[in-house]
């Protein structure tokens, strides 16, 4: 008798992806973040769907509709805070996932890596548009400042900004279209995640040693389903602690004031997960230069496979590159801190040094370290 999961057309796909998938026997907990990102996406789509049932994308009623959700809808406060903190959780997992990819050289799988970068851009776009929807002070001014950056594009900039706004300022048309895009993009992200998995399963997973593991593979189920389940339990414990005890920890108090175009907040800043890129943007005095640096701060990830000089894939046995990696992590944390500070000394110069260091580590120090390590190993 044939096993149904191996013959049924639909179940066969699930089987090849999650049950009988040959997986390296030595992948660590750092490989859990892919499945955790899938869980975050499910939480966001589910909670977002229920929020959309009660939300109205209109400048006059958007803020009060969010208040209505929190006060009058059954467990509306819970759904709202799950959605808001779910975004933070999504980005925590996302950055850890990318960090693991850099540390263990997973960027060698070019297709998977490039789809991942597209996923990062899509997620950032979705999160930005979602932040505009509650129509608080930081929603309005964040939308105004960030969309205005496009006006730095030569010749077409101003027209492009007005086209995105649907008028001459951020208004009802902007809010309406942002809601439409914010609703559809997570489904596009889900589809792209499938493509991400498809390309990954073409090559098989990387492993901490960064060496081929064809001789030592084990089935995904039950070994890694159990391991993923442990990750999911820990993630949910952290998530619900955040949602139920510290729901406003990562938010901005300014967003509890309704949007007012006549009153600018003292410090306009995006959510915490964009602060590192925002700090890079602010560290360049020129508007166009800042926008280019902002885009390159993410797009630079696409260069990693092309500027790798080391003969070893993983950083596991490369102490110089390891030091540079953790220096890069520290630098991103410094940039995140600077992004939330006002534009005044000494924060300006700290931000400029940290921004320069960010690009220098990736473009110069890491490739040079790879060559030095090759020499040390007489390769």
From Swiss-Prot:
Binding site for heme b b566: 97, 196
Subcellular location: Mitochondrion inner membrane
CDD domains: cytochrome_b_C, Cytochrome_b_N
Cofactor: heme b
Binding note for cofactor: Binds 2 heme b groups non-covalently.
Residue sites binding a ubiquinone per the record: 201
Residues bound to heme b b562: 83, 182
UniProt-listed Gene3D superfamilies: Cytochrome Bc1 Complex, Chain C (1.20.810.10)
Topological type in the membrane: Multi-pass membrane protein
UniProt keyword terms in alphabetical order: Electron transport, Heme, Iron, Membrane, Metal-binding, Mitochondrion, Mitochondrion inner membrane, Respiratory chain, Transmembrane, Transmembrane helix, Transport, Ubiquinone
Cellular component GO terms, alphabetical: mitochondrial inner membrane; respiratory chain complex III
Main location: mitochondrion
SUPFAM superfamilies, sorted: a domain/subunit of cytochrome bc1 complex (Ubiquinol-cytochrome c reductase) (SSF81648), Transmembrane di-heme cytochromes (SSF81342)
Biological function: Component of the ubiquinol-cytochrome c reductase complex (complex III or cytochrome b-c1 complex) that is part of the mitochondrial respiratory chain. The b-c1 complex mediates electron transfer from ubiquinol to cytochrome c. Contributes to the generation of a proton gradient across the mitochondrial membrane that is then used for ATP synthesis.
Subunit architecture: The cytochrome bc1 complex contains 11 subunits: 3 respiratory subunits (MT-CYB, CYC1 and UQCRFS1), 2 core proteins (UQCRC1 and UQCRC2) and 6 low-molecular weight proteins (UQCRH/QCR6, UQCRB/QCR7, UQCRQ/QCR8, UQCR10/QCR9, UQCR11/QCR10 and a cleavage product of UQCRFS1). This cytochrome bc1 complex then forms a dimer.
Family in the record: Belongs to the cytochrome b family.
Other observations noted: Heme 1 (or BL or b562) is low-potential and absorbs at about 562 nm, and heme 2 (or BH or b566) is high-potential and absorbs at about 566 nm.
The protein's name in its UniProt record: Cytochrome b
Originating species: Dipodomys nitratoides
């Amino acid at each position: 008798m044939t096993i149904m999961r191996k013959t049924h057309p639909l179940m066969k796909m699930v089987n090849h992806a999650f049950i009988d998938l040959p997986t390296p026997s030595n992948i660590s907990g750092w490989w859990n973040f892919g499945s955790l990102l899938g869980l975050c996406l499910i939480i966001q789509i589910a909670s977002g769907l229920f929020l959309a049932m009660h939300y109205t994308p209109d400048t006059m009623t958007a803020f009060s509709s969010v208040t209505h959700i929190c006060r009058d809808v059954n467990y509306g406060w819970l759904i709202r805070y799950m959605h808001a903190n779910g975004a933070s959780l999504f980005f925590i997992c996302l950055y850890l996932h990318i960090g693991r990819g850099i540390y263990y050289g997973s960027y060698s799988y070019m297709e998977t890596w490039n789809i991942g970068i597209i996923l990062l851009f899509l997620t950032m776009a979705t999160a930005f548009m979602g932040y505009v929807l509650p129509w608080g002070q930081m929603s309005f001014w964040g939308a105004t400042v960030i969309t205005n950056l496009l006006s730095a594009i030569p010749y077409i900039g101003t027209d492009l900004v007005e086209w995105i706004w649907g008028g001459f300022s951020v208004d009802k048309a902007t809010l309406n279209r942002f809601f439409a895009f914010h609703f559809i993009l997570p489904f596009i992200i889900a589809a792209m995640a499938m493509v991400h998995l498809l390309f990954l399963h073409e090559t098989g997973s990387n492993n901490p040693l960064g060496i081929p593991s064809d001789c030592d593979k084990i089935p995904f189920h039950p070994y890694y389903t159990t391991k993923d389940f442990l990750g999911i339990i820990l993630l949910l414990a952290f998530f619900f602690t955040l949602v139920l005890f510290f729901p406003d920890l990562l938010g901005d108090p300014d967003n509890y004031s309704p949007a007012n175009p006549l009153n600018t907040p003292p410090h306009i800043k995006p959510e915490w997960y964009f602060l590192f890129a925002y700090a890079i943007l602010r560290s360049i005095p020129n508007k166009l230069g800042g926008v280019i640096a902002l885009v390159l701060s993410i797009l630079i990830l696409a260069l990693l496979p092309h500027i790798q000089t080391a003969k070893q894939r993983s950083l596991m046995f490369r102490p110089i590159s390891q030091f540079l990696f953790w220096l890069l992590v520290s630098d991103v944390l410094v940039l995140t801190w600077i992004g939330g500070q006002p534009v005044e000394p000494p924060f300006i110069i700290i931000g400029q040094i940290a921004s320069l260091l960010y690009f220098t580590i990736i473009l110069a120090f890491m490739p040079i370290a790879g060559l030095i390590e090759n020499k040390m190993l007489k390769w």
